[in-house]
């Protein structure tokens, strides 16, 4: 399944993997998964985290390595983001609930994920998704961006 991914997708997923793999040891533990999920406003229990890891942990190590992560991402892309997941993600980004994701909200989320972005990088991300040019991302623009990934 992971062999259907392009090199660009693999390198994007490698970047995402490093965000999760806080200590850089090449595996994602339940603790690391929990940290990332909490920074995104989720509050999973230890058992839920273990279930998530067990779902993709093919070698029974109790952690997720990069090949397992790729398989998970390929699977996720196949049953493509359901509308509910996209709505949920939009709500996480849209901190003040006004129906738009501003540069400040985007920067806040990315910083929580451990991504230190310059103002230029954040503005560039907004510009890429901002179809109507109002300087922020509305729900329709967000859906388009998520579907084109």
Swiss-Prot record:
Which SUPFAM superfamilies does its entry note? EF-hand
Residues that coordinate or bind Ca(2+) 3: 94, 96, 98, 105
Query: Per its UniProt entry, which superkingdom is the organism in?
Result: Eukaryota
* Any one GO MF annotation of this record: calcium ion binding
**Which keywords does the record carry?**
Calcium, Metal-binding, Methylation, Repeat
Upper lineage is: Eukaryota, Discoba, Euglenozoa, Kinetoplastea, Metakinetoplastina
Name recorded for this polypeptide: Calmodulin
Under the heading InterPro entries, the entry gives: CALM/Myosin/TropC-like, EF-hand-dom_pair, EF_Hand_1_Ca_BS, EF_hand_dom
Q: One GO term of the cellular component aspect?
A: cilium
- Membership in a protein family: Belongs to the calmodulin family.
Q: Which organism is it from?
A: Trypanosoma brucei brucei
N6,N6,N6-trimethyllysine modification sites are 116
Q: Which residues bind Ca(2+) 2?
A: 57, 59, 61, 63, 68
Residue span(s) of domain EF-hand: 8-43, 44-79, 81-116, 117-149
Xref: Pfam families = EF-hand_7
Residues at which Ca(2+) 1 binds: 21, 23, 25, 27, 32
The UniProt function text for this chain reads: Calmodulin mediates the control of a large number of enzymes, ion channels and other proteins by Ca(2+). Among the enzymes to be stimulated by the calmodulin-Ca(2+) complex are a number of protein kinases and phosphatases.
Which sites bind Ca(2+) 4?
A: 130, 132, 134, 136, 141
Q: What else does UniProt say about it?
A: This protein has four functional calcium-binding sites.
């Amino acid at each position: 399944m992971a062999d259907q991914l392009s090199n660009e997708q693999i390198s994007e997923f490698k970047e995402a993997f490093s965000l999760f793999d806080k200590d850089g040891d090449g595996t994602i533990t339940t603790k690391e998964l929990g940290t990332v999920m909490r920074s995104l406003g989720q509050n999973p229990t230890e058992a839920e985290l273990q279930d998530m890891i067990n779902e993709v942990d093919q070698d029974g190590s109790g952690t997720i390595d990069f090949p397992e992560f790729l398989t998970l991402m390929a699977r996720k892309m196949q049953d493509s983001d359901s509308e509910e997941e996209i709505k949920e993600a939009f709500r996480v980004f849209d901190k003040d609930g006004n129906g738009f994701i501003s540069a400040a909200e985007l920067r806040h989320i990315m910083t929580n994920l451990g991504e230190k972005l310059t103002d230029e990088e954040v503005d560039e991300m907004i510009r890429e998704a901002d179809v109507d040019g109002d300087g922020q991302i509305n729900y329709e623009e967000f859906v388009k961006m998520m579907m084109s990934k």
